[in-house]
């Protein structure tokens, strides 16, 4: 049977047993943001097992897409080195929700294995939990398995638990003996690849309490799982999952792309590389098809690690250009009918993978050079361990995940100081945290809180009103500010990217200007920066404000600022929806800043957003604004209910049990605690100001709305009119063609000037061409040329190395206070005399307190110390002579 027939026969078998054949859940668990990836078939039924959900059916079966590349289920570093580890796999499974139980589950499993798939009964073993006498007896009575092949094991092997508490129960596993002589009974559950588990039947019958006791469940469930790749290999008579027809098309494609042929060897480096690439391509394709994106944290970073491992392994096959994206079509062709999302998302997935490959290949070469330098230093010093600092530099500067550096180190017989790496990582996180704290935390150099009422959470009433009467709860001076807490307030405290409200607080004696509002736990803190004494009718410093007894406060939010902020906040929701519509559903919000003046929106995307795409996004947003739909706010919605409504929720975001949902019907629905307009028509219009990169895979759009957008358009119109006037264009003439013509003229003139300057520079170097010391037939040329840019020195060096058959030289100069060094070596000097311009310039650069490097024939360096140039020349000449001896 081929793999397609095996998968279908499983589903057909259980359809014949009155099971609902359900679709695989996405590998990105949409309703469980705490889980990185779907890693088992039961994930989509977790709510049923927990008693929180139901289904319209009581029997189900499917083939579930799974990824295990993080947490306790992490097979990443084992992939490629054995016959069975994968980061992506399919899990065939059947379930009973309070319907059939052990008798049917065991009987049907045996029927499928032995009667449908014709596996040899004498090679099969069944394991049961040592206290599960019911299952033990059912194996004897409901199947014709050899009774000596029914084995008992303990908690580690045959008791399943969802967590420390909750649903659990005994399980029964079916193993197959693949030893040549069928003597593998003693190898069951010892981790020997010759006797492997095929199917796990879990019988969920208990609820584990916090004290460890087991309470019987009112309903008993069945949850089974069988690795599709493993059973395909067994049924096809293969000793490795990778030798089945599941992987054969991928290996064929790798051979087409690299010229390397797969030989099914466990030890061959090229075969290991091909297994890794095939596995990782599957993981990436399925994850991206389900909406994941490579990134710098969470599941995004797991995917980026996987992709970079694949790219590096492709390099070991001699391929140093993007190829992983070219394998996606193989999966679409071989699995697209089973998983239609592959074909639907093919173009997007290919673009994402290609962009990631191209990005990493830029740094991979330089990072590998640094790694090789570190290895050379380690071996010279007699060390066998790469320092944590060096490993962290490769991670932080060149994007090498630690597991990639660990792999490369192992290939040359070195280890890594992983504790040192973690120390460097923690230091960086601490610095970042302190930096954020320094930027965000209010000054804390004042006195203690003065309390006027019992401490309690502040009630926020600002969704419904902008003014209210309140009572002062506490106050404190902090530097030149006064911090005030009220029992209730209409002031929105900064959170979720939306800045805090401004406004006034008025008491019987003071009018206080609030210029920021922050959260402190469950309390809202109003930051007062100026005050007016109403009794004396004069300005006072916030520190001079004093209160006595019960203080009534009239709190009033600056209406214009709030309304402008609301326009921009609702606009971010519309922008998010438009980006997902135009660019694809892989787009996810990664951050935002909403102020009265403008909005900033960070989102996941694999490449620069083109001008045409930005125009389309802006058009989509403004078209919706013109429809003037009402904005609906759903308050205090249970989290699960919000997800059922279709609200967007992403991994890594923390949500309360009850949430607020902001909906623009038919356009956008998001979990959001911010303030919004009542009707999107109030936004007026949105104008995108800029699009830029924030980090790898993260883009940023800045935009303005309403009056600010109108003002921007008028300014752009005035600028255009001024340009047309300067160019003496008629009203109906376009400025673009004329500007392009002028730029082309300027480019030609710049080129003439550059050629003229280079010719003059070479004339100045004529003496060096004629002179210069010769050693072993190689002329050594050095010259200092102040006032000449590094780029001009480089052009001169290129010209010089082509004019002298065998020469090596160093050109130095100081321009704008910066030292530039350019070393060159002619082809003859490189090939015959083994001179290395990169090494020579690096040694010379130390004299000017700088560094650099480059290729064998041409290299550059910079420095901070002009006084060291003469010394740099001496070092260069000495290094050349030493190399030529």
From Swiss-Prot:
Zn(2+) binds at residues 569, 573, 672, 676. Its EC number is 6.1.1.7. It comes from the Bacteria. One of its GO terms (molecular function) is zinc ion binding. Gene3D superfamilies: 2.40.30.130, 3.10.310.40, 3.30.54.20, Bira Bifunctional Protein, Domain 2, Threonyl-trna Synthetase, Chain A, domain 2. The keyword RNA-binding applies. Its main location: cytoplasm. The keyword Ligase applies. Binds 1 zinc ion per subunit. One of its GO terms (biological process) is alanyl-tRNA aminoacylation. GO terms for cellular component: cytoplasm. Keywords: Aminoacyl-tRNA synthetase, ATP-binding, Cytoplasm, Ligase, Metal-binding, Nucleotide-binding, Protein biosynthesis, RNA-binding, tRNA-binding, Zinc. Its cofactor is Zn(2+). It is found in: Cytoplasm. SMART domains: tRNA_SAD (SM00863). It catalyses: tRNA(Ala) + L-alanine + ATP = L-alanyl-tRNA(Ala) + AMP + diphosphate. It holds the Pfam family tRNA_SAD. InterPro entries: aa-tRNA-synth_II/BPL/LPL, Ala-tRNA-lgiase_IIc, Ala-tRNA-ligase_IIc_anticod-bd, Ala-tRNA-synth_IIc_core, Ala-tRNA-synth_IIc_N, Ala-tRNA_ligase, Ala_tRNA_ligase_euk/bac, DHHA1_dom. Belongs to the class-II aminoacyl-tRNA synthetase family. NCBIfam families: alaS. Consists of three domains; the N-terminal catalytic domain, the editing domain and the C-terminal C-Ala domain. The editing domain removes incorrectly charged amino acids, while the C-Ala domain, along with tRNA(Ala), serves as a bridge to cooperatively bring together the editing and aminoacylation centers thus stimulating deacylation of misacylated tRNAs. Catalyzes the attachment of alanine to tRNA(Ala) in a two-step reaction: alanine is first activated by ATP to form Ala-AMP and then transferred to the acceptor end of tRNA(Ala). Also edits incorrectly charged Ser-tRNA(Ala) and Gly-tRNA(Ala) via its editing domain. This is Alanine--tRNA ligase. The lineage of its organism: Bacteria, Pseudomonadati, Chlorobiota, Chlorobiia, Chlorobiales.
